[in-house]
């Protein structure tokens, strides 16, 4: 758990959240998640069985004592807005606690949508000023982690910083996917590079680079001045990582905050857990992380609960089918409302209301809400999108050629099906990769399989009649 150096530090850390407003940037499309974000914003994507991705940032705010929160939305926001209204409306407005939705509005002063992360905040400055906060915490709404923001606030105040950026070491091979910083011994940021082609390594640790987590703390008045300057700067992309943070390094007013100082964990022996689930590969792996025997992210820690909208669902059920086969699961997460009948589920995540019929094997797969799996199916290393009905007898993830003809795969950057319905998978997972399956493609496949069964049954009837007639003629 997070530790404080003294009682005075602890007391100050408890006071600072009351002077703070958190702004969660939740308007991104998340195009690398392909069809998972075709109809919903990335922070609204399902995760870990019962949660949405944004629940982690929201829960971190509440658990840290930051109870004034603005959620900035834009792309496909309906699902996200609905989730927040249903699951996060319990804060006490009389105590000045709230989750405020800030959609893109194309105000009179600008007819454009949000042009970047900084512009998303800038276009809401009139609202944010009325919050009357001393400190602004800016968060990405699409990361999976548990963090005590009060500890980062304390670090920000004690160093006298105008801006503080949370940081974490990442493999040098992945550094080009993040904002990378160089720091002094006391973590003052001296240089910042947004997604550099050749990221500089950490001194003394050539295998890692120091990456930004997309978490910023600003003194409120200083942030307002910065955003107004950036808004009037020709050629700016109006982005924190590309424009705001790099210019602050020259002013020597920005510090880094190591994530291990504020990471919340129930097991000090495990490394700090933070995942950017911006690709299907990363999303699939992060979900299955939770199904491991000892996951690095403890979802059962009562001291730091992850809250979400709770649907009134019955418990998951594992039943015996008519043949006597028992439904069973191993190293998996199975959500409320699921029924597994005479099938085996291994190292997988079943989201709410999933139905798995008899004689199926589900291995290393994610079945999103309302998926229905017909009898005798075998699914391996798949992501099955919401409300898909897998037809009886379908096998996915065992034959590379067949999968390439029907779905996008992750092997060698993904195979594109002629139909173009399934979401392309980025990255490579051995040996076969995993597949992303969408409803509209499965409808076509289901019709083909049913037609095939119809032809086979009629052929069997014809052959039976033929042999009967032949036997009658032979008897005469």
Swiss-Prot record:
Organism: Yersinia pestis bv. Antiqua (strain Antiqua)
Lineage: Bacteria, Pseudomonadati, Pseudomonadota, Gammaproteobacteria, Enterobacterales
This protein's record includes keyword Nucleotide-binding: yes
Entry superkingdom: Bacteria
Gene designation: glgC
Record has GTP-binding as a keyword: no
Any Gene Ontology biological process: glycogen biosynthetic process
Reactions it catalyzes: alpha-D-glucose 1-phosphate + ATP + H(+) = ADP-alpha-D-glucose + diphosphate
Protein name (database record): Glucose-1-phosphate adenylyltransferase
Pfam families: Hexapep_GlmU, NTP_transferase
Single annotated GO MF: glucose-1-phosphate adenylyltransferase activity
Subunit structure comment from the entry: Homotetramer.
Record NCBIfam families: glgC (TIGR02091), PRK00725.1 (NF001947), PRK00844.1 (NF002023)
SUPFAM superfamilies linked to this entry: Nucleotide-diphospho-sugar transferases (SSF53448), Trimeric LpxA-like enzymes (SSF51161)
Pathway in which the depicted protein is active: Glycan biosynthesis; glycogen biosynthesis
Enzyme Commission designation: 2.7.7.27
Protein's job: Involved in the biosynthesis of ADP-glucose, a building block required for the elongation reactions to produce glycogen. Catalyzes the reaction between ATP and alpha-D-glucose 1-phosphate (G1P) to produce pyrophosphate and ADP-Glc.
Residues bound to alpha-D-glucose 1-phosphate: 114, 179, 194-195, 212
Family to which the UniProt record says this protein belongs: Belongs to the bacterial/plant glucose-1-phosphate adenylyltransferase family.
Keywords: ATP-binding, Carbohydrate metabolism, Glycogen biosynthesis, Glycogen metabolism, Nucleotide-binding, Nucleotidyltransferase, Transferase
């Amino acid at each position: 758990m997070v530790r404080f150096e003294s009682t005075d530090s602890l007391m100050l850390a408890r006071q600072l959240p009351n002077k703070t407003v958190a702004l969660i940037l939740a308007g991104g499309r998340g195009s690398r998640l392909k069809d998972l974000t075709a109809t919903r914003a990335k922070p609204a994507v399902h995760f870990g069985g019962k949660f949405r991705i944004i629940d982690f940032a929201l829960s971190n705010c509440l658990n840290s004592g930051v109870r004034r929160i603005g959620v900035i939305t834009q792309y496909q926001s309906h699902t996200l807005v609905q989730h927040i209204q249903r699951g996060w409306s319990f804060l006490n407005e009389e105590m000045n606690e709230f989750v405020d939705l800030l959609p893109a509005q194309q105000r009179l002063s600008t007819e454009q949508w949000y042009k970047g992360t900084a512009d998303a905040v800038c276009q809401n400055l009139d609202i944010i000023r009325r919050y009357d906060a001393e400190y602004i915490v800016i968060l990405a709404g699409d990361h999976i982690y548990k963090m005590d923001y009060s500890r980062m606030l304390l670090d920000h105040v004690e160093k006298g910083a105008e801006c503080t950026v949370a940081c974490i070491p990442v493999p040098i091979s992945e550094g080009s996917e993040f904002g990378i910083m160089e720091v002094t011994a006391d973590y003052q940021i001296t240089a910042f590079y947004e997604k550099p082609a050749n990221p500089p390594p950490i001194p003394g640790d050539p295998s890692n680079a120091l990456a930004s987590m997309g978490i910023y703390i600003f003194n409120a008045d200083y942030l307002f001045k910065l955003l107004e300057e950036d808004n009037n700067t020709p050629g700016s992309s109006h982005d924190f990582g590309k424009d705001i943070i790099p210019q602050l390094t020259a002013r020597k007013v920005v510090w880094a905050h190591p994530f291990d100082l504020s990471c919340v964990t129930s097991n000090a022996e495990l490394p700090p857990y933070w995942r950017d689930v911006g690709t299907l590969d990363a999303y699939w792996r992060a979900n299955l992380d939770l199904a491991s025997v000892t996951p690095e992210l403890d979802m059962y820690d009562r001291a730091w609960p992850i809250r979400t909208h709770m649907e009134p669902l019955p418990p998951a059920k594992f039943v015996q089918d008519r043949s006597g086969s028992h439904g069973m699961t191993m190293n998996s997460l199975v959500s409320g409302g699921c029924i597994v009948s005479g099938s085996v589920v291994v190292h997988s995540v079943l989201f709410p209301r999933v139905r798995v019929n008899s004689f199926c094997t589900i291995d290393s797969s994610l079945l999103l809400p309302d998926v229905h799996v017909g009898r005798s199916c075998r699914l391996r290393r798949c992501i099955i999108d919401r409300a898909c009905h897998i037809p009886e007898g379908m096998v996915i993830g065992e034959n590379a050629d067949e999968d390439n003809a029907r779905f996008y795969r992750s092997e060698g950057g993904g195979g594109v099906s002629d139909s173009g319905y399934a979401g392309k998978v980025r990255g490579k997972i051995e040996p076969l990769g995993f597949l992303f399956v969408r409803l509209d493609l499965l409808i076509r496949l289901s019709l083909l399989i049913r037609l095939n069964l119809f032809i086979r049954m009629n052929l069997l009837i014809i052959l039976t009649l033929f042999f009967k007639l032949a036997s009658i003629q032979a008897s005469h």
